[in-house]
């Protein structure tokens, strides 16, 4: 069985009650994988633990159960192998745009000469349309420009995985769309592996290869994994003309409005969070559900994954 680039198995986060009571289990038994070069979005209602999961992937927080393996190694603490972009830009206010990016590049490659650091940093700022704003301080930039700097800084260290926590949530619609296009172009050019939190189903359909649907908390878990079967080369201007678009969108909205409640607390009947179903609602004729393969048991040969087809033939 092929090894996945990122493997999340049995992840749980519990917060103890200082009064000695049972405490709060935000999520438990969270399982999913991401392949190298894949763009995965996670969607769910507030309070289900999406940002906590991202922080665990970043090494900024510790899970109370389960584990995360990236590129064959368990994640334990922050690393330059993972670039993070938060909703807030988190720029150093006393540094220029260029120096903010150079700061990360120097940390990644401490042996580089100054000219090499500057050229590398400038290239990534130009990729997000900031070639004319290299020497401006953050206070001189708009919200969209600040977020572009954060994206350039994350890409410039060439991480094995990029983690995005609602990076466009505070931006106006026009700026948001422009940066989405820039992000798509860079991801496709660099084959970057991405894990992104969003509340915007349209954004997820545009950007992602697959979408992880999270049930409501507490005791949240991955309910479904939706594969986006619309071919790559998507654009904001044309994606809604694809016949798959509204089938996928309606499926996502129905989950968020109706079906996510079925998983509250203990979970929906018959749902196994260790093997959340893979759903392809964009395909004509109905969804195809594929049970994810179980983790490899090295003492026995792996069984073939079951395939349940809900499509009409």
Segment roles from a protein language model:
Residues 58:
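Helix-to-loop junction immediately C-terminal to a conserved catalytic motif
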């Amino acid at each position: 069985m092929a090894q996945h680039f990122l493997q999340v198995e049995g992840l749980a986060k519990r917060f103890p009650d200082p009064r000695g009571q049972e405490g709060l289990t935000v999520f438990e038994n969270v399982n999913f994988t991401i392949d190298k070069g894949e763009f995965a979005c996670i969607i769910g209602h507030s309070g289900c633990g999406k940002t906590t999961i991202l922080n665990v992937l970043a090494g900024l927080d510790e899970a109370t159960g389960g584990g995360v393996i990236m590129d064959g190694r368990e994640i334990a603490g922050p690393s330059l192998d993972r670039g993070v972009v938060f909703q807030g830009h988190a720029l150093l206010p006393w540094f220029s745009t260029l120096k903010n990016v150079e700061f990360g590049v120097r940390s990644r490659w401490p042996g580089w000469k100054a000219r090499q650091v500057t050229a590398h940093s400038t290239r990534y700022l130009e990729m997000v349309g900031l070639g004319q704003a290299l020497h401006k301080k953050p206070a001189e930039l708009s919200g969209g420009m600040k977020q572009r700097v954060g994206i350039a800084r994350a890409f410039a260290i060439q991480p094995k995985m990029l983690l995005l926590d609602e990076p466009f949530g505070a931006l106006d619609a026009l700026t948001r769309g422009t940066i989405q296009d820039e992000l798509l172009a860079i991801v496709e050019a660099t084959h970057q592996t991405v894990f992104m939190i969003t509340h915007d189903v349209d954004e997820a359909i545009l950007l992602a290869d697959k979408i992880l649907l999270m049930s409501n908390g507490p005791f949240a878990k991955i309910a479904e994994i939706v594969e986006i079967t619309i071919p790559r080369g998507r654009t904001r201007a044309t994606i809604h003309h694809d016949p798959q678009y509204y089938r996928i969108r309606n499926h996502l909205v129905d989950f968020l409005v109706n079906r996510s409640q079925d998983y509250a607390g203990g979970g929906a009947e018959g749902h196994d969070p260790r093997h959340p179903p893979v759903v392809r609602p964009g395909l004509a004729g109905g969804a195809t559900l594929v049970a994810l393969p179980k983790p490899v048991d090295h003492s026995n040969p792996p069984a073939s994954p079951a395939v349940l087809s809900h499509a009409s033939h």
